[in-house]
Amino acid sequence: MTTRIDTRFGELKQQGRPALVTFVMAGDPDLDTSLQILKVLPAAGADVIEIGMPFTDPMADGPAIQAAGLRALKAGTTLKKTLGLVRDFRATDNATPLVLMGYYNPIYIYGVDAFLADAKAAGVDGLIIVDLPPEEDEELCLPAMKAGLNFIRLATPTTDEKRLPAVLANTSGFVYYVSITGITGSASADASAVGAAVQRIKRHTNLPVCVGFGIRTPDAAQAIAAQANGAVVGSALIDALKASLNAEGRATKATVGAVADLVASLAAGVRGAKQAAE
């Protein structure tokens, strides 16, 4: 089974360049604007798109992504509507990989089998579920793989040699290396430490390794992407979106462009990493 994620990383490998992976929250600041943002991301330079599933108790997320989730929930975003966004995006883009990222609770409430069937039918390619450890693979990971979805796992600086094989055992698509311990959007990542960590992970897997948490600028994206198969940017995009909203927290004419412009500059940074990596 080859997914859109496998295909995209295969293409990038042939081109000799890392991926820019972008994270946006479904339904932030509202469903219509959210769809417009999703639609402009590929042209702006996003190679893979992670879509956050809003949740009331996002314990691993920093203030920016928590606030984005609250805006989305306030706008009436549900898991069903998030899958609707994916379906609407797929009407005009059948190539860009889409990964749903979030917590297990909303999926559990939706019903695992129903969720996997609906996600696959909508055009979802993979899942990142931050609060399901490998010990609970039967809950969602194994059924997701059976349904033809990639299950992408997080590795961190505290994932030691003993733990790493368990983390990687049923991982597919790519590995998401969290470059700093703590919550999203906090301190910046150290490129040389990231490089050593990526090499350590690659000794255990042939999967691409993408690095996220703490990447906010084109320079940082370039430095990190040079050490890995991709750079993941989330909080910086959410901050750009938030800065474009009006006093009531609603979208303005500048909102979609604010996100697209930042993605374009980050993409230029990541594409510049090809030379840095050689």
Swiss-Prot record:
Alphabetical list of Gene3D superfamilies matching this protein: Aldolase class I
Enzyme class: lyase
EC number: 4.2.1.20
A family per Pfam: Trp_syntA
Keyword Amino-acid biosynthesis among record annotations: yes
Involved pathway(s): Amino-acid biosynthesis; L-tryptophan biosynthesis; L-tryptophan from chorismate: step 5/5
InterPro entries, A to Z: Aldolase_TIM, RibuloseP-bd_barrel, Trp_synthase_alpha_AS, Trp_synthase_suA
An example Gene Ontology CC term for this record: cytosol
Molecular function as annotated in GO: tryptophan synthase activity
UniProt catalytic activity: (1S,2R)-1-C-(indol-3-yl)glycerol 3-phosphate + L-serine = D-glyceraldehyde 3-phosphate + L-tryptophan + H2O
Keywords from the UniProt entry: Amino-acid biosynthesis, Aromatic amino acid biosynthesis, Lyase, Tryptophan biosynthesis
Active site: residue positions: E50 (proton acceptor), D61 (proton acceptor)
Function: The alpha subunit is responsible for the aldol cleavage of indoleglycerol phosphate to indole and glyceraldehyde 3-phosphate.
Similarity comment: Belongs to the TrpA family.
Description of how the protein assembles with itself and partners: Tetramer of two alpha and two beta chains.
Protein name: Tryptophan synthase alpha chain
UniProt source species: Rhodopseudomonas palustris (strain ATCC BAA-98 / CGA009)
